Amino acid sequence: MSKLECKDLSKSFSISGDTIEVINNINLSITEGDKVAITGKSGAGKSTLLQILASLDSPTSGRVYLDKTDFASLSNDGLSQIRLHNFGFVYQFHHLLDDLSVEENISIPLSLKNELNSKSKILINKTMKELDIYERKNHLPWKLSGGEKQRVAIARAIVTKPKFLFLDEPTGNLDRKNASVIQSLIFEMSDKYGIALISATHDNDFISSFENIYEISGTKLNKIYE
């Protein structure tokens, strides 16, 4: 099973000549199938940590590894391949392409992997049915509700069956009813396909469903539930 881990991870920013430390000396190990929630106050560094773990940002110091491959040893193209073949992403806002249909939006990761064929068409249809958006397959995003848009975002993220799914406030822009539905779908897909969940969230209902809960406070990552 694949393992994503960081060792002695720190990140700071320079603002007007002052150094602002966001996270300091963080160590974390996540294996396929794990469910990890990271909470903390706004600005605590939750999203920053997710960005670094997902190879979308670089730490000031420390290392991130996927199965012993050091991200620091890879080129930008190498990191893109890591993300394409191992990671999925769902954000607070769906980030769908407005001029593409539901089906076309979901097909993007498969197209990037040069895997768009008759077999992948079956996979896309299956994923849409699992997330109850098959009847919307030809709709453009503007015709969808907020909850439906987030389902499409989840479908796009999991259609390639990634090993790790990064979730940055995935229920933050939804009402309670839709948030509950999205929460259930995320965990259902994780359990079904063994996808690890790594989420930054303020949603207490969402947090309570995770097996491992961490909090970033004072630049440190502390485990508060296992």
List the predicted regions and their residue ranges.
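Conserved signature/switch motifs of ABC ATPase nucleotide-binding domains
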Residues: L84, H139, T160
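Catalytic Walker B motif of ABC-type/P-loop ATPase nucleotide-binding domains
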Residues: L165-D168
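Helix-to-loop junction immediately C-terminal to a conserved catalytic motif
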Residues: A54
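Short coil-to-helix segment of the ABC ATPase nucleotide-binding domain corresponding to the Q-loop/switch region
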Residues: L100-S107
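Conserved ABC transporter NBD signature motif
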Residues: G62-D70
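Hydrophobic anchor residue at the start of the ABC signature
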Residues: I154
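Conserved ABC ATPase signature
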Residues: L140-E148
